[in-house]
Curated annotation (Swiss-Prot):
Gene3D superfamilies: 3.30.1360.40, Winged helix-like DNA-binding domain superfamily/Winged helix DNA-binding domain. This is Arginine repressor. Regulates arginine biosynthesis genes. It comes from Corynebacterium glutamicum (strain ATCC 13032 / DSM 20300 / JCM 1318 / BCRC 11384 / CCUG 27702 / LMG 3730 / NBRC 12168 / NCIMB 10025 / NRRL B-2784 / 534). GO terms for biological process: L-arginine biosynthetic process; positive regulation of DNA-templated transcription; protein complex oligomerization; regulation of arginine biosynthetic process. InterPro entries: Arg_repress (IPR001669), Arg_repress_C (IPR020899), Arg_repress_C_sf (IPR036251), Arg_repress_DNA-bd (IPR020900), WH-like_DNA-bd_sf (IPR036388), WH_DNA-bd_sf (IPR036390). GO terms for cellular component: cytoplasm; protein-DNA complex.
Length: 171
């Protein structure tokens, strides 16, 4: 069975074992982003396998397939641990913020419900603007100077906890 074969007609439908069917499902999910069970059943039919929705649901469940929705993208079926599922597809604003903080954050401090982020000269406004656009639920807003960003924590979070969250450290 190969992907991209001629469309199936009733004469060329293949009887197939559950194991072979599930192996083909894994192969299809590995090669392309499948966004619905209808799409997957059509792809299986193209390979000569006619399957009911109930059987397909059961197969997906047994394979541990789940829908993954990348930030700003369309959900698709994936199999395996989240870390091994097309990591680049899961990189949305939050992942970009993590990378940006890793690159720009020099140090953190805090007072009350304010986290103070120190950056290299000239980077604070860029970082603050991105924090605002990401829309973290823990953040009320930001104020930036040249190399310092004040980030106001939303209650009940403290400035210390917010600084730890943003810096990736926990104590």
């Amino acid at each position: 069975m190969s992907l991209g074969s001629t469309p199936s007609t009733p004469e060329n439908l293949n009887p197939v074992t559950r194991t072979a069917r599930q192996a083909l499902i894994l192969q299809i999910l590995d090669k392309q982003k499948v966004t619905s069970q209808v799409q997957l059943s059509e792809l299986l039919l193209d390979e000569g396998i006619d399957i009911t929705q109930a059987t397909l649901s059961r197969d997906l469940d047994e394979l541990g397939a789940r829908k993954v929705r990348p930030d700003g993208g369309r959900a698709y079926y994936a199999v395996g641990p989240v870390d091994s599922i097309a990591r680049e597809d899961l990189r949305g604003p939050s992942e970009k913020l993590r990378r940006m903080l890793d690159e720009l954050l020099v140090s953190t401090d805090h007072s009350g419900n304010i986290a103070m982020l120190r950056t290299p000269p000239g980077a604070a406004q860029y970082l603050a603007s991105f924090i605002d656009r990401v829309g973290l639920k823990e953040v009320v807003g930001t104020i930036a100077g040249d190399d310092t960003v004040f980030v106001l924590a939303r209650d009940p979070l403290t400035g210390k906890e917010l600084g730890e969250l943003l810096s990736g450290r926990t104590t």
